[in-house]
Amino acid sequence: MTVKKLYFVPAGRCMLDRSSVNSTLTPGNLLNLPVWCYLLETEEGPILVDTGMPESAVHNENLFEGTFAEGQILPKMTEEDRIVTILKRVGYKPEDLLYIISSHLHFDHAGGNGAFSNTPIIIQRAEYEAAQYREEYLKECILPNLNYKIIEGDYEVVPGVQLLYTPGHSPGHQSLLIETEKSGLVLLTIDASYTKENFEDEVPFAGFDSELALSSIKRLKEVVMKEKPIVFFGHDIEQEKGCKVFPEYI
């Protein structure tokens, strides 16, 4: 079975210090990076990958003021970037979704998880546990009483949607290998690799464990060599220019 449609859905932007994208650079310049959600239409039902930024980021570039990330991360979010608004735009309500896949629980990927009180949220155990105590996780991204489906390691969500365990950027990060009807195999690295440079040249970037992150990149490179998918990176400004976004699909 294959995924009928894979939509790239813009979910705002985030100003991030260039040293977070390339750790060899000195801090000081902010880059204007895209934030993405991905909608998969499958035979079993619609699946949403990541939920964007939290409500607290709407028109609030100072979200991280007084924290470890002050001046390093500036969210650029409007009401139109709220996950419920995004879903309405693409024709769904929260209760329509079969699953939420949380690649990881950072603020720009899991900020909207609270909109889904009943939908199963698929998350790696290592990520769920780390988010309980590590300072880089906002409370909106690890709300109690949601319907978490906790997994460990690689996992097939439905036929054609494979989760690949790629820790490093965060303790329990996961990427996706998706078989689509239109474009064949697609690899979403998500934040296992922000950019093509991180991936192809193994340029280090921000994260929990740089050695583990590099191991995950090497693992994904092996997947690419074997499976020959189209590869999309998590926050690549140059790649964004050529991305087909909703209502187009791949």
Swiss-Prot record:
Zn(2+) 2 binds at D108, H109, D191, H235. It comes from the Bacteria. Monomer. Pfam families: Lactamase_B. Zn(2+) 1 binds at H104, H106, H169, D191. Binds 2 Zn(2+) ions per subunit. This is N-acyl homoserine lactonase. Belongs to the metallo-beta-lactamase superfamily. InterPro entries: AHLLactAiiA, MBL_superfamily_lactonases, Metallo-B-lactamas, RibonucZ/Hydroxyglut_hydro. Keywords: Hydrolase, Metal-binding, Zinc. GO terms for molecular function: acyl-L-homoserine-lactone lactonohydrolase activity; metal ion binding. Its cofactor is Zn(2+). It is an enzyme of class 3 (hydrolase). It catalyses: an N-acyl-L-homoserine lactone + H2O = an N-acyl-L-homoserine + H(+). The keyword Cell cycle does not apply.
